[in-house]
């Protein structure tokens, strides 16, 4: 991915039912009309099974021509489990990964063999050399667990110094936050592509909950506007307009 090129990717959640998989398959094929660099597939938190991710990736790989990029998280996992997942992805012909630390669910015990994303990145490169193309995550508004924005930025740039393609950000709704983040990264010599992550607005309660959990700050103007809508269809319509404007900017 060229730094200044304009590309799209779409992120999917693994469905929990066969009918959900069929519906996702239809959606993904429709999305191929908008050429995407890749489709990414998320996974469960805290080292939970990644079988759903693999099943979804396999379906999309067979049904579409778009490259598929499974998310893989190190938190709560040991080397054997991660290696098993990586070999399964390689056997399927998948070459792109989104590598994350991941979040521990409440009450989870062991952090596993990979306390940070950079540990997992190093492990993947040691085991598979340059077979996988790696994207990483980033928090333009600072990771909720970070000691300070400065330390968070330092650790992010350390992660980007590895043999990775670039990064995808956590969602945000203030474009100035993203542009400032890019500027701060470049001051530290971190110049690989950082793709903005944009989440559709379809439900007010879900948006507020996810923003709180992820440390994403919602602009007051957005909150005020959302408060004027009581019907979900109206929220969705406004969300499409708002996010479309954000993407254009």
Stretches found by the model and what they are:
Residues 6-14, 39-41, 68-72, 97-99, ...:
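Hydrophobic faces of well-ordered beta-strands that scaffold small-molecule active sites
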Residues 77-90, 151-155, 179-183, 203-209, ...:
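Catalytic cores of alpha/beta
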Residues 1-41:
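Conserved N-terminal beta1-alpha1 strand-loop-helix module at the mouth
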Residues 7-23, 68-80, 133-151, 227-241:
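Active-site mouth loops of central-metabolism enzymes
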Residues 12-16, 43-47, 74-76, 101-105, ...:
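Active-site-proximal loop/turn and secondary-structure-junction residues that shape catalytic pockets
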Residues 19-21, 47-60, 78-84, 103-125, ...:
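Active-site-adjacent beta->alpha loops and helix N-cap segments on the catalytic face
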Residues 19, 112-139, 188-248:
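Active-site pocket-lining/capping segments in soluble small-molecule metabolic enzymes
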Residues 145-164, 177:
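Active-site glycine-rich loop that binds ribose-phosphate moieties when present
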């Amino acid at each position: 991915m060229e730094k200044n090129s304009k590309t799209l990717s779409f992120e999917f959640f693994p469905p929990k039912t066969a009918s959900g998989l069929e519906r996702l398959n239809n959606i993904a094929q429709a999305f191929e009309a908008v050429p995407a660099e890749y489709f990414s597939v998320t996974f469960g938190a805290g080292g939970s099974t990644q079988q759903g991710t693999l099943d979804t990736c396999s379906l999309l790989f067979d049904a579409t021509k778009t490259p598929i990029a499974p998310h893989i998280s190190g938190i709560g996992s040991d080397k054997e489990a991660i290696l098993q997942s990586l070999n399964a992805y390689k056997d399927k012909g998948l070459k792109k990964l989104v590598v994350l630390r991941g979040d521990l669910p409440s009450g989870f015990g062991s952090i596993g063999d990979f306390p940070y994303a950079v540990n997992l990145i190093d492990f993947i490169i040691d085991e598979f050399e340059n077979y996988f193309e790696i994207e990483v995550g980033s928090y333009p508004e600072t990771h909720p667990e970070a000691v300070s924005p400065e330390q968070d930025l330092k650790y992010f740039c350390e992660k980007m110094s590895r043999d990775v393609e670039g990064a995808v950000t956590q969602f945000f709704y203030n474009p100035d936050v993203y542009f400032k983040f890019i500027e701060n990264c470049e001051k530290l010599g971190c110049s690989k592509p950082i793709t903005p992550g944009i989440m559709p607005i379809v439900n007010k309660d879900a948006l507020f909950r996810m923003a709180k959990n992820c440390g994403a700050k919602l602009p007051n103007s957005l909150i005020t506007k959302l408060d004027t809508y009581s019907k979900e269809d109206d929220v969705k319509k406004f969300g499409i307009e708002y996010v479309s404007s954000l993407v254009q900017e």
